[in-house]
Amino acid sequence: MGIRSYQAYPPGTRDGSIVNSKEMVNSKEMIESEPQKVLVRGRHIARGRNHRGIITSRHRGGGHRRLYRMIDFRRDKRDVSGEIKTIEYDPNRNTCICLTNYGDGKKRYILYPHGIEIGNKIISGIEAPISIGNTSPLSTNMPLGASVHNIETRPGRGGQLVRAAGTTAKILAKEGQLVTLKLPSGEIRSLPQKCFATIGQIGNIDANNLKLGKAGSRRWLGKRPSVRGVVMNPIDHPHGGGEGKVPIGRKKPLTPWGHPALGRKSRKRRKYSDTLILRRRMA
């Protein structure tokens, strides 16, 4: 289990839980060390503001200071074997990261695949064997039903799909130049067979069971409070105004900008990938 529940001594920790990295890795060899300096950079936090200081994304700001670990989503070290040296904590995500030492002397961080251990060998290439942590195109000998993550949407672009903690996608079919995948959201879509993907499931399978327990835990993550529109003034929200505790005064709920809040599709119309989506994600 990668989730550890709090004891309910103070009210703030009642029903709260945290991510326990050591239990998630299920290994006594997890390294608690400083990250590699060459693989770390400062992280500019925009706090939900644009270049003029105007809020463009609400409920963001604050949070604990942290350094960003540069993750190798491209896995473009073709046919160069690497060894897992450490499994480290990453404050920027709910899963761990693995420091990989390659045969040419380079070091890179990758996402922690569930079940991998320190000392294991990984490789990326067209002829990479079917093993946890290896990366290869979807067109090679990946069997139907295989679990993959860190999937490219276009060849050479780097992994963009299925990168969250505990997620995985399954290969359903191969036809022509396309491969059909079932994503964690329930969406079924096709991708070019030349796209690379990493074999296995991302660590921390119990990430969806995480409960922060108190408002302060959200503030540590850089998430500010979400205020209901019905308690605002009319100038701030369509639901605002009225004497005392009153209904919203509308037939349907609206966003702060006056658009329908429930049931309206937010996906961009006539997107290039619409033809590749065979079934939309489950709401």
From Swiss-Prot:
Organism whose genome encodes this protein: Aneura mirabilis (Parasitic liverwort)
Renumbered residue ranges of the record's region Disordered: 229-274
Residue ranges with Basic residues bias: 262-271
GO cellular component terms, A-Z: mitochondrial large ribosomal subunit; plastid
Gene3D superfamilies: 2.30.30.30, Nucleic acid-binding proteins (2.40.50.140), Ribosomal protein L2, domain 3 (4.10.950.10)
Quaternary structure annotation from Swiss-Prot or TrEMBL: Part of the 50S ribosomal subunit.
Main localisation: plastid
Record's keyword terms, sorted: Plastid, Ribonucleoprotein, Ribosomal protein
Source domain of life: Eukaryota
Name of the protein: Large ribosomal subunit protein uL2c
Taxonomy of the source species: Eukaryota, Viridiplantae, Streptophyta, Embryophyta, Marchantiophyta
Pfam families: Ribosomal_L2, Ribosomal_L2_C
Localization of this protein: Plastid
A single GO molecular function term of this UniProt record: RNA binding
GO BP annotations listed: mitochondrial translation
Family as reported in the entry's similarity comment: Belongs to the universal ribosomal protein uL2 family.
Alphabetized SUPFAM superfamilies for the sequence: Nucleic acid-binding proteins, Translation proteins SH3-like domain
Gene that specifies this protein: rpl2
InterPro entries for the chain: NA-bd_OB-fold, Rib_uL2_dom2, Ribosomal_uL2, Ribosomal_uL2_bac/org-type, Ribosomal_uL2_C, Ribosomal_uL2_CS, Ribosomal_uL2_dom3, Ribosomal_uL2_RNA-bd_dom
